[in-house]
Swiss-Prot record:
This is Probable tyrosine phosphatase protein J2. Its EC number is 3.1.3.48. One of its GO terms (molecular function) is protein tyrosine phosphatase activity. Belongs to the protein-tyrosine phosphatase family. Residues 21-286 form the Tyrosine-protein phosphatase domain. The gene is J3. SMART domains: PTPc, PTPc_motif.
Amino acid sequence: MPIEDKRMRIMDFINFVRKPDSLSCIIQEYRAIVPEQEDGASKSCNQAVNRAQDENNALPIVRLVHSRVNLFSKEKVMSARYVDGYNHKQKFIITINSCENNTDKYLQMLWDNNVQIVVTTSSHAEKNNFNRFWSLNERTVITYNNFQIETLEIITKPHFVLTLLVLTDQKGQARKLSHFQYTAWPADGFSHDPKAFLDFFFNIDSLYADLRKHKTIGNVGPITIDCIDNNSSSEVFCVLDICLTEVKKTGMLSIANAVKKVRQKKYGCMNRLNDYVFCYHLIHAYLSMTFDIVKVR
């Protein structure tokens, strides 16, 4: 079923967000996309999908099966889904605590997909359930069954940390890996700084574009985004990328359409109202800064 075209021109979008009743319209739009019983139920939704795969049951939507991530060995990577960008198939892999139970499988997924950028969109330093696969000490190597991961350099910025890594397989083949961790995602999931997230996003976007321009080992793999807190932070990143790419190419955008496309690939995603509203704040901030729009009175 085709997605309804709800795209807006840049000026129309900016004027819409600045209207006094824009928030109520955004909430109404969100409610039309996300069923009420699904709101905030990300963890249970993903568990349901994984259980269905384990039992070889048919999923409610067949396309979800095609978006799951398999290794070359045909093993499934639980809670990992391919997500398309704007006119870019499988630009992302979205995961939830993917290396929590099997770090080797997670690293194999990165290797098989030629991943060179890993992103964590929420702070996890204090999370007990996060299994960090690299060392926090520079020039330190951690050895797993099938891989070694070396921490080369840790670069700390005001709202994110960039860790430069080298992933080496059993044959001694090595690949560089850049890990970006966003450290400014608010604990309340609401008090965001759009400029901080945009700066984080564009640092990643710039590196990805540079890697594609100067690729040395085949096609650059998907950007892998690992969400730790079971919120929609990883989907916020994808929706932002889809919308900004579309507006640069066409001069139009639709957050609703972008969210629907992501939800076609990842069951139960973007099911927190705060995160949906944040997408509007992000894109409004970007457009206002980029086009230097004077506030309409």
